[in-house]
Every structure is written in structure tokens, then in C-alpha cells.
UniProtKB/Swiss-Prot annotation:
InterPro entries: DNA_mismatch_repair_CS, DNA_mismatch_repair_MutL, DNA_mismatch_S5_2-like, HATPase_C_sf, MutL/Mlh/PMS, MutL/Mlh/Pms-like, MutL_C, MutL_C_dimsub
GO molecular function: ATP binding; ATP hydrolysis activity; ATP-dependent DNA damage sensor activity; mismatched DNA binding
SUPFAM superfamilies: ATPase domain of HSP90 chaperone/DNA topoisomerase II/histidine kinase, DNA mismatch repair protein MutL, Ribosomal protein S5 domain 2-like
GO biological process, one term: mismatch repair
Pfam family name, one: MutL_C
Role according to the record: This protein is involved in the repair of mismatches in DNA. It is required for dam-dependent methyl-directed DNA mismatch repair. May act as a 'molecular matchmaker', a protein that promotes the formation of a stable complex between two or more DNA-binding proteins in an ATP-dependent manner without itself being part of a final effector complex.
The protein's name: DNA mismatch repair protein MutL
Length: 568
């Protein structure tokens, strides 16, 4: 008998469901999209236990009759398209006929619907209909209730996150619907707590609701893009404040992130906030390239990208008095931008000098082994700095050691030393400062959920916090953090946890990383004495990179210098 065999239908169904249903948040996503496609103007969402045990979505849409209700939980049944070409003229969210079918296969589901002339309730377990009966539903619309998600796929259920984390994922997705559909009323409850009660309004009001920390923003309106963006003064360390929609579908597209930030040009600090709606004719965009429709393809992307950059740049004139330099989208770095030495002011009559220098310099740089995150072993060096140090462009320190010449980035070095000092304090025990006046920080709902998730861990690391409805109050802080820095540092610490890959990162390292921002900056007038002390501290601790992995030193050995001067 051959080794290849056809999988049973129930196995195929569960595997396929996994492509659509990643967790409670994706159930909410699919059900809310169905409600919007049904023309709902009011949608109520409720979850319990992070959505693991119960999810409910109720709408006032057009509803379904008995015949449609029976077909709704079977795969590839849809009212949106008739043949493949219809995909390129879509105005709805759903079209594959997979969502309800996939959800039904991995849960116990109850659907109650009234289309204005008849009302029925369907109950199914694991994708199999158990009953369909007439049911008195007073209001026109549909109620979908999902119980015990992944009850029949224990391996998938095992990999769900904690209830608090799954709840946060749902909150974040609900926020995307609030932004993309400001004209729809949303009520969202979690474990009997009202998270959002958002009346129909407009984008500006919804933006303020989701991002209360942003005080400077402006609406934008281009040929293909519209939305709302923050001033350069408001930004995050990651792109969680950037939410993009194409035809009102939420998308995650690296190129769109880049193009948006490109519009900020030289005004860019970190990652600004932005809610963008890209509107193009349906036939010019393909949404059928990702199982969860998170990616899109444009038939002519350059005109879209140019419009985004131009529109953002024009809008920012409201905030930035000086002219913003916007790099061309496809601009490549020139040699002068990537070279470690500037040579434009040096005029050598003999080109061979520069060629020879570049050859030796390249050889010294090639000694760096980034894979080991180590430039060279400094643990056994004589820590004495020979002669005086030289400060270069208020950025670098040049000094001589026994084996060569070193150039050190003093900001990166100071940052790493502070990072190590803070880690040492955190490991020994936290010394806290009780604040006479608590520091109140405005946060959105999803950030508040992260604080709740990490409350105990934050307390262990020196932050005493009281969570309130629209804000968090910080009652005590670690002694090494200045009260004036608390707002920025705390937001950055919490923001780290919005990125799933950061969830496993030790909070002590995150706090140390953020707190070391007090390091001297490039441009600081560092004295020779300060520079020598910093060099000694770095060598004593055997440090070679900053907390983010960038090298602290460039080293050119005397052997390499001798080689250049033909003294070998």
C-alpha cells in the first residue's frame, strides 16, 4: 500500500479552519465583518475568558431567512460573488464563504437571525447542525454566539495565550473596526465590563478615543489616501500606532509603513501615529493574496505610494516650519552615506593613497564578527589609555591602547554602561521612590490591558500602579528613574509588549533599556577626563556593543597601520 493517502474530511476541515481562525480575535474579526457586510449600523460584541469560552456578536443588519441560515455554516457558500472575476470588483469584506464554516468546525455555535419576515435559531457542534427552529427574535438582525473555541482541537487550544492576552488581542482588533467604521455604533463588553461604548461619530473623534495620548494631529486628504496623522512630536518606538486600511480592510504592508514614514522626511523621530485609508477602484487591488486578507497587491503601486508621501508631506507643514526633506522612494544610498570616513574635503593628487587606505580600512572592518555580537576580546587588556584622548565632532572619542588606535561612540558606550548599572540594581533588589503626587498617564484601552497583564511584574520591578478608567496612576517608581522621565519611559516599557515577539523579553532588560536613555547624547561637550573614565569603565566591564547590538568601537591595529606604510 502506498504511503500517500487522502485525509478524512473532518481533518481537512479543521486544518482549513486554522488558516482562518487563529484565535478569539479572528473570530471577532470575521463576525464583525459579516455584520458590516449585512449593513449593520449598530454592533454589540461580548467576550468571556478572553474569548476562549464565549464570543457574541449582535447586529441590526439585514438578517437571514431559514434557507440562508442553513447554508451559512457550510464552506464556500457566499452571497458576495458568483464567479472568480467578481473578486476584482468587491465592495464587501467576505467573499470566500469560509469564515462561519471555519468557526463552526472548531466550536459550538448558535446563530439567531431575523430578516424582517422570519426568525430562526441554528445550533451546531463541530460544524454539524444539531437543530434549526423558529425563534422569536424581536429585532431585525443576527446574533452569533460561539462557545468553547477549539474544544475539538486541543492542540490549537493549548497554544492560545492567557485570557488577559487574548482579551487584549480582541480589544486591539475592535479598535481597528472603531477607526475604520466611525459611522457605526459599537458596544464592546469583556467579562461584563464595558470596554467601549462608542456612538456613531467621525474619524477624528474615534482617533481621540483610541489614542488619547496624541494631542497634535491633522486630517489628510489626497487623491488615493485620506485619514489622520500625528505631528512629529508624537511617536512610538514601534509601529503599533500606524493602522492602514485598503478599501476599509485592515492591512499590514511593510511598503506602506515605509512610504508613510518617508513622508515625514527629516522631521521623523521614531514611528509617528497614522490612520490611513487607501481608496482605489476594486479592480486595481487584489485582496485575495493572504488567508486573513492582511496583504494586498496594487496593479500600479507607484501612483499610490507617491500620493501618500506627497499628502503626508503637505499636511505636516502645519506642524513643521522648516522645509521637510523627503527622500525619493527608490533612492539608493550613496557611497558617502554608507562610508565610515568622510573624504569629500580631502583632495589627494595620488588616487592610490585613497585606494590603499580604503584597502587597509576595509581589512580592519572585516575583522568584526557580528555573528558573535563581539568585536574583539577586551577582557585581558591593559586598561590604561596611552596619552591624551581626542574628541571627534562631539560624537566619537579617539584614543591609543597598547595594540592600536580605537574610535569609540561615546553615546553608545555611556548608554551601555548605564544599562549594566541599572541591571545590577534590578537584580540585587529594587529601591523605590514613593511619589508625593502620583503621575497620571493617559492610555488607550489596549495599552491599559497590557498594564493589567503586567501589573505584578511591574510591581516587582519598582512600579506601584493604580489602573483607572481612562488612565493609569503611578504611585511609586524605581529610584534610578527621574520623575520627569516617567511618562516617556513607562509608555515605552508598555509599548514593547504590543509586539508579540517582545512578550518573552525579560522586563528587567526592558526597563534597563528604556531607563538608559539618560546617557549623554551625541553633540554633548564631553571632557577628556569624562571620556577617559568612560573608556576605563567600558573596558573594565568588557563591553563591546550598545544595548541594541551596535558596536562601541572601531579598532585599527598598529600592524594594519604598519602595513599601510609598508613597514611590515
Amino acid at each position: 500500500m502506498g504511503k500517500i493517502k487522502k485525509l478524512p474530511e473532518h481533518v481537512i476541515g479543521k486544518i482549513a479552519a486554522g488558516e482562518v481562525v487563529a484565535g478569539p480575535y479572528s473570530v471577532v474579526k470575521e463576525l464583525v465583518e459579516n455584520s458590516l457586510d449585512a449593513g449593520a449600523t449598530k454592533i454589540e460584541i461580548e467576550i468571556k475568558s478572553g474569548g476562549k469560552s464565549y464570543i457574541k456578536v449582535k447586529d441590526n443588519g439585514e438578517g437571514m431567512g431559514r434557507e440562508d441560515l442553513l447554508l451559512s455554516i457550510y464552506e464556500h457558500t457566499t452571497s458576495k460573488i458568483n464567479d472568480f472575476d467578481d473578486i476584482y470588483n468587491l465592495s464587501s469584506f467576505g467573499f470566500r464563504g469560509e469564515a462561519l464554516a471555519s468557526i463552526a468546525k472548531v466550536s459550538r455555535i448558535v446563530i439567531t437571525s431575523n430578516n424582517g419576515s422570519e426568525s430562526h435559531r441554528l445550533e451546531a457542534i463541530g460544524g454539524k447542525i444539531k437543530s434549526v427552529n423558529e425563534y422569536p427574535l424581536v429585532e431585525k438582525g443576527t446574533i452569533v454566539e460561539v462557545y468553547d473555541l477549539f474544544f475539538n482541537v486541543p492542540a490549537r487550544r493549548k497554544f492560545l495565550k492567557s485570557e488577559a492576552t487574548e482579551k487584549r488581542y480582541v480589544v486591539e482588533y475592535v479598535e481597528k473596526f472603531l477607526l475604520s467604521n466611525p459611522d457605526v455604533e459599537f458596544i464592546f463588553r469583556a467579562d461584563n465590563e464595558i470596554i467601549y461604548n462608542a456612538r456613531a461619530s467621525n474619524l477624528e473623534e474615534r482617533f481621540k478615543l483610541i489614542f488619547p495620548e496624541v494631542k497634535e494631529y491633522t486630517l489628510i486628504n489626497g487623491k488615493y489616501v485620506e485619514g489622520i496623522i500625528s505631528s512629529p512630536n508624537y511617536h512610538r518606538k514601534n509601529r503599533t500606532g500606524q493602522i492602514f486600511f485598503v478599501q476599509k480592510r485592515f492591512v499590514m504592508d511593510k511598503m506602506l509603513y515605509y512610504i508613510f514614514e518617508n513622508g515625514y522626511g527629516e522631521a521623523l523621530v521614531d514611528h509617528p501615529y497614522g490612520v490611513l485609508f487607501i481608496n482605489v477602484p476594486s479592480k486595481l487591488v487584489d485582496v485575495n493574496v493572504h488567508p486573513q486578507k492582511l496583504e494586498v497587491k496594487f496593479s500600479n503601486p507607484n501612483i499610490i505610494y507617491s500620493d501618500i508621501t506627497r499628502t503626508v508631506r503637505e499636511a505636516l507643514k502645519k506642524f513643521v516650519s522648516k522645509q521637510i526633506f523627503v527622500k525619493p522612494i527608490n533612492e539608493k544610498k550613496t557611497k558617502s552615506e554608507v562610508s565610515s570616513f568622510e573624504t569629500k574635503n580631502v583632495n589627494f593628487s595620488n588616487d592610490s593613497f585613497q585606494d590603499k587606505f580604503n584597502s587597509v580600512f576595509k581589512e580592519s572592518v572585516n575583522h568584526v564578527d557580528y555573528s558573535k555580537n563581539m568585536l574583539f576580546d577586551i577582557s585581558e587588556k591593559n586598561l590604561e589609555v596611552k596619552n591624551d584622548v581626542v574628541i571627534l565632532k562631539k560624537r566619537y572619542v579617539l584614543f591609543e591602547m597598547e595594540d592600536g588606535i580605537y574610535i569609540m561612540d561615546f553615546h553608545a558606550a555611556h548608554e551601555r554602561v548605564i544599562y549594566e548599572q541599572i541591571l545590577e540594581k534590578l537584580k540585587v533588589g529594587i529601591e523605590k521612590i514613593d511619589l508625593i503626587i502620583p503621575i497620571e498617564i493617559k492610555v488607550g484601552k489596549s495599552l491599559k490591558q497590557i498594564v493589567i497583564e503586567k501589573l505584578d511584574e511591574l510591581k516587582e520591578n519598582g512600579f506601584e500602579i493604580k489602573v483607572e478608567n481612562e488612565s493609569v496612576k503611578i504611585l511609586s517608581i524605581p529610584s534610578f528613574i527621574k520623575p520627569s522621565d516617567v511618562d516617556d519611559i513607562f509608555k515605552e516599557i508598555i509599548d514593547e509588549y504590543r509586539i508579540p515577539s517582545m512578550g518573552t523579553k525579560n522586563m528587567k532588560h526592558i526597563i534597563a533599556d528604556k531607563a538608559c536613555k539618560s546617557a549623554v547624547r551625541t553633540g554633548y561637550d564631553i571632557t577628556e577626563g569624562e571620556a577617559k573614565k568612560l573608556i576605563e569603565e567600558v573596558f573594565k566591564r568588557n563591553l563591546t556593543t550598545c544595548p541594541h547590538g551596535r558596536p562601541l568601537f572601531l579598532k585599527i591595529t598598529f600592524n594594519e597601520i604598519d602595513k599601510y606604510f609598508d613597514r611590515t
